[in-house]
């Protein structure tokens, strides 16, 4: 079986909903990343077999194809857009790696993009062609049958209650995320991930959701979103805009082209869980991944779990017995933001730049009751 390696990874800084990137469509968010790869790796871009991108709430059409054409890549390069909800970016990386393993191609660009600010309004079509009632707008499509389709906030509350994750633990984890993110912005770790872009004449190179200046005590002052609950705006991620791209190729070709380090894809697992508890998906996904590869949690140096809500990450940490020295050691989405279709690719990008780590996992809890996890080693 061929081996797939990730040899380059970049992302935009993540804008908050209605923030600096609010006027950019998904293909426009991706354009500078494609152009960066095109300029830096011209001998590789000409060999691309496919572009695979994750997206959830985009503007329609095949965004992967639209984006590569918008960026001036060759007409002969195909593109495919994947929707596994907020796991789409991680799914796109695994898809490209699996295609290489299977011998279907040797060079892929994978990643994800989301503009929550430019997400189209959705209107349900009336049953009658003579409908006179006003259109009914809705926030999102359903993830599961009506009785098992909680809002993401309610899903987080369900997890918090079932796994006994207190408000205090949630706030403490959120504070940790902001502090670790700020620390790794300051020391330059996170800046490695980000490609600065020019937006309306200004350089944009910093995630807008980070609030490192908020004192720890302030997290406890936020009111629960649902009366009587524990999930608040402070211990939940924000809606965000942003894009991520990774260059993935067959290992022997990577060496031939002069790439000397990166991530080797080892395996990936996707599982289903009760859709009322979507955030707990990483638990069986990571457990199955470890078992299949004859590993234990102690064998993994770093585990990146997407921080949609403190409640679900803390529950996963406790259930899997993950130490603080393993989990989200540069912070996470509670601070940096969660551009849905890009977030999974962002987790892998973060692992890519942890050059001193050898064995790593990226994992997502996904709306509709899914869990996804991927195993990487350094090459």
UniProtKB/Swiss-Prot annotation:
CDD domains: thiolase (cd00751)
Pfam families for the chain: Thiolase_C (PF02803), Thiolase_N (PF00108)
Molecular function in Gene Ontology: acetyl-CoA C-acyltransferase activity
EC number: 2.3.1.-
Keyword Acyltransferase: yes
Class of enzymatic activity (EC top level): transferase
Keyword field contains Calcium: no
Keywords: Acyltransferase, Transferase
Any one of the GO BP annotations: fatty acid beta-oxidation
Active site: 86, 338
Gene Ontology cellular component annotations, sorted alphabetically: cytoplasm
Family according to the record: Belongs to the thiolase-like superfamily. Thiolase family.
Note in the entry: May contribute to vancomycin resistance.
PANTHER family linked: 3-KETOACYL-COA THIOLASE, PEROXISOMAL, ACETYL-COA C-ACETYLTRANSFERASE YHFS-RELATED
This protein's name: Putative acetyl-CoA C-acetyltransferase VraB
Organism: Staphylococcus aureus (strain Mu50 / ATCC 700699)
């Amino acid at each position: 079986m061929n081996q797939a390696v990730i040899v380059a990874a970049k992302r935009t800084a993540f804008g908050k909903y209605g923030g600096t990137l609010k006027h950019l469509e998904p293909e426009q968010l991706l354009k500078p990343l494609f152009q960066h790869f095109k300029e830096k790796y011209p001998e590789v871009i000409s060999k691309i077999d496919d572009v695979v991108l994750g997206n959830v709430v985009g503007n329609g059409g095949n965004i992967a194809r639209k984006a590569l054409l918008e960026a001036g890549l060759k007409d002969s390069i195909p593109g495919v857009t994947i929707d596994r909800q907020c796991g789409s970016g991680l799914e796109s990386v695994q898809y490209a790696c699996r295609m290489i393993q299977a011998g279907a191609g040797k060079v892929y660009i994978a990643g994800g993009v989301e503009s929550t600010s430019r997400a189209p309004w959705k209107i349900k079509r009336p049953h009658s062609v003579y409908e006179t009632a006003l259109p009914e707008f809705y926030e999102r499509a359903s993830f599961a049958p009506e009785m098992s389709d909680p809002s993401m906030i309610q899903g987080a509350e369900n997890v918090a209650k079932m796994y006994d994750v207190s408000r205090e633990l949630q706030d403490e984890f959120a504070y940790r995320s902001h502090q670790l993110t700020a620390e790794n912005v300051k020391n330059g770790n996170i800046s490695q991930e980000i490609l600065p872009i020019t937006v309306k004449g200004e350089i944009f190179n910093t995630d807008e959701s980070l609030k490192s200046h908020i004192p720890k005590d302030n997290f406890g002052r936020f009111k629960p979103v649902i009366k009587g609950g524990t999930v608040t705006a402070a211990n939940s991620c924000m809606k965000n805009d942003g894009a991520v791209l990774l260059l993935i190729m067959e290992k022997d070709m990577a060496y031939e082209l002069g790439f000397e380090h990166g991530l080797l894809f080892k395996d990936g697992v996707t599982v289903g869980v009760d859709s009322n508890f979507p955030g707990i998906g990483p638990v069986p996904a990571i457990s199955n991944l470890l078992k299949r590869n004859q590993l234990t949690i102690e064998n993994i140096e770093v585990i990146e779990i997407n921080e949609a809500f403190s409640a679900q990450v803390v529950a996963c940490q406790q259930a899997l017995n993950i130490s603080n020295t393993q989990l989200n050691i540069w912070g996470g989405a509670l601070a940096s933001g969660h551009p849905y279709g890009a977030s999974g690719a962002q987790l892998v990008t973060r692992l890519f730049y942890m050059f001193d780590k050898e064995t790593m996992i990226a994992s997502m809890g996904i709306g509709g009751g899914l869990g996804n996890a991927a195993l990487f080693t350094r090459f």
